[in-house]
Regions:
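One-carbon transfer enzymes
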Residues: 1-213
Length: 213
């Protein structure tokens, strides 16, 4: 199976990629570096705690790096010409986790091969930080992870995996991203295993959640 991952550089993305690669060899990773400038503060008050916790949780005393067997490219924007040249290969699956919105051109290039890791319950919360918006709305039963096909709308594609988080009394807010990432690993591995067996399960999103940013 020929697998491409489109992502950004961070501890939880690195851990995700390495875990997938252990069972299904990843051919290439393209990291996107662009960021959207805002005229207001976007850093969360617990971001530093989150980063520190994830480095310990995922890597402890080992080096935080992508496995040496994976080809890695770093570009500004996954939708630019350089990226499109890199991804013209015949990939069987393109996994999107953490980069910007994918252009309609790339969606059409890969048709039904693009899957998205959405750290939230997409049927209820679309867009960025869906898990935090669920908390804001006191909607604790709709915190989890969704794996879905990518279509030309945002987080509305057919669902391949959806699972809610199990919370422990000792959990902190900065543990949340690691929990949704662990579910992402479970969901993507389940999808790839089903794909290997020719037993693909998907369901349409009947409820289309509100978009948050």
């Amino acid at each position: 199976m020929n697998i491409l991952v489109l992502s950004t550089i961070s501890a939880h993305h690195t851990y995700f990629i390495n875990k997938i690669d252990k069972l299904f060899k990843i051919s290439q990773v393209i990291y996107e570096t662009r960021s959207i400038e805002k005229d207001f503060e976007t850093k969360s008050p617990f971001e530093d705690d989150e980063i520190e916790y994830e480095k310990k949780y995922y890597f402890n005393k080992t080096k935080e790096k992508i496995r040496d067997t994976i080809k890695v490219s770093v570009i500004d924007d996954v939708n630019n010409i350089k990226s499109i040249d890199l991804i013209k290969k015949d990939f069987d699956v393109v996994i999107v986790f953490g980069c910007g919105i994918i252009s309609s051109h790339i969606i059409k290039m890969f048709n039904s091969k693009l899957i998205n890791v959405h750290r939230g319950i997409a049927r209820k919360y679309r867009g960025l930080d869906s898990d935090l918006w669920a908390i804001y709305n006191n909607d604790f039963i709709n915190i989890g992870t969704t794996i879905h096909f990518i279509d030309e709308r945002l987080d509305t594609g057919d669902i391949l995996f959806e699972k809610n988080i199990t919370f422990e009394s000792s959990d902190k807010i900065y543990h949340l991203r690691s929990k949704t990432t662990d579910l992402a690993i479970e969901g993507v591995l389940e999808y790839l295993q089903n794909m290997d067996l020719g037993n693909l399960n998907k369901k349409k999103q009947i409820d289309i959640g509100k978009y948050f940013s």
